[in-house]
């Protein structure tokens, strides 16, 4: 039971104001909570930085990575995963971008460069088209960004320690796979790395944003207008309708009936993961038609509410 917010006792007359303060705090918030035994705890609000590396594992030379957002603040942790994959000599990779709405272009370059390894040296990761006025200043030449394998500036290092040199990967996708997630798919296909898509059609966001700071009086604003469209090394960038899966599986209705959830990430009760495993092994993996009825108390809900799509940010 929540009894106080910012030292203000909750009453029937102020409950709505307290609720608003709780869900949309304008300043640090302190709350008091009383448990069933009457013991009172004080909880202070603070920033939480969620690690986008949700899960990773290696099983029989197959690497599996669940990545929820391209957050450059966690690039070291991401690179460490690829170094682990390389140290275990994986030969196959399942990249799970089902709930990844995008993020930093730099992190998309990191993950793409580690996947490609030596195959991407001195090759184009992406080129960018801006509006007509800006393109005139650039001589109507799209600026090119190389794969960062040889030198990744955000970590001030080469990515060779995590380079996998893979010519094919399996990517799990949904409509929530957007922007920088699609940039990775497009960039790898641009250098002839086969990206097998399993799931449903991706969102279709081939444009990105740049941050602009504005000041109005004493107020400061940080805006992120859409300013560019991204293309791969082959000049392809028209994926505004999304990428169509090679193997279409709706994770909510894989067998024609609604699935409430699956087991842990990397479990073969997950039909998308199971399909990737079957394609790699050549053996069909059967997923239960009623996973929701099995050990329901242990369920990890996969069919999450739609996440905010944070876009492709330079």
Predicted regions span which residues?
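A broad structural signal for short, well-ordered beta-strand segments within beta-sheet-rich domains
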Residues: 2, 50-54, 87, 166
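PDZ-domain C-terminal substructure recognizer with occasional recognition of PDZ-binding tails
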Residues: 17-56
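Solvent-exposed coil/turn segments that connect beta secondary-structure elements
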Residues: 7-8, 36-38, 46-48, 68-70, ...
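Conserved PDZ fold ligand-binding element
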Residues: 1-16
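C-terminal "post-core" interaction segments
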Residues: 62-65, 69-80, 84-92, 101-314
